[in-house]
Amino acid sequence: MKNDVISPEFDENGRPLRRIRSFVRRQGRLTKGQEHALENYWPVMGVEFSEDMLDFPALFGREAPVTLEIGFGMGASLVAMAKDRPEQDFLGIEVHSPGVGACLSSAHEEGLSNLRVMCHDAVEVLHKMIPDNSLRMVQLFFPDPWHKARHNKRRIVQVPFAELVKSKLQLGGIFHMATDWEPYAEHMLEVMSSIDGYKNLSESNDYVPRPASRPVTKFEQRGHRLGHGVWDLMFERMK
């Protein structure tokens, strides 16, 4: 069946023919605290990119459900979730090193042992390092919406990406997205609804209430005060 949702050009393996990145590298200046965290805590919690598949039990030293978060920003929500769910393991990916440093600092302060972080392009990590059928959940919160129509192709949520995520989820695993940009929420819903093997967990077949497991960010709180909406989508891998 032809899928009518617009996507960048991909080959038969789902890899981009020309790499369209969904992010812009804005490295920014590291604070002394972030620099200290990268130097001292990366050796313990950091994961270098490689072309070898990760062994999660070896990485975390135990067998436990694994959640992958893509684009964790400064890491406040990711650290809070890892702290609240010590029985689960978390891998966060972020391309901006100040955010990685901030996350490492917070995770160290909380004494977390169930969190690992990467500083790399998430699509490459998914292709090269995440084993199929290995993740309990994939989280994508507030990705860049690329507001202008001519930039919509840069949005990370496209059919090949959603198919790739599905292949990494276990059966029954969840892909959880959130955005504060309604046109992007509609785009996400269109993309996800077009793919065989996903089930929308919304009772109204569109959006779900924010689950208690997703912390409200400071950015989100400010948006609520200004009357801005937030849309959560949760899709389960069914086959």
Swiss-Prot record:
S-adenosyl-L-methionine binds at E69, E94, D121, D144. Catalyzes the formation of N(7)-methylguanine at position 46 (m7G46) in tRNA. Pathway: tRNA modification; N(7)-methylguanine-tRNA biosynthesis. This is tRNA (guanine-N(7)-)-methyltransferase. The keyword Transferase applies. It comes from Escherichia coli O1:K1 / APEC. PROSITE patterns: SAM_MT_TRMB. Residues 150-155 are annotated as: Interaction with RNA. It catalyses: guanosine(46) in tRNA + S-adenosyl-L-methionine = N(7)-methylguanosine(46) in tRNA + S-adenosyl-L-homocysteine. Belongs to the class I-like SAM-binding methyltransferase superfamily. TrmB family. It is an enzyme of class 2 (transferase).
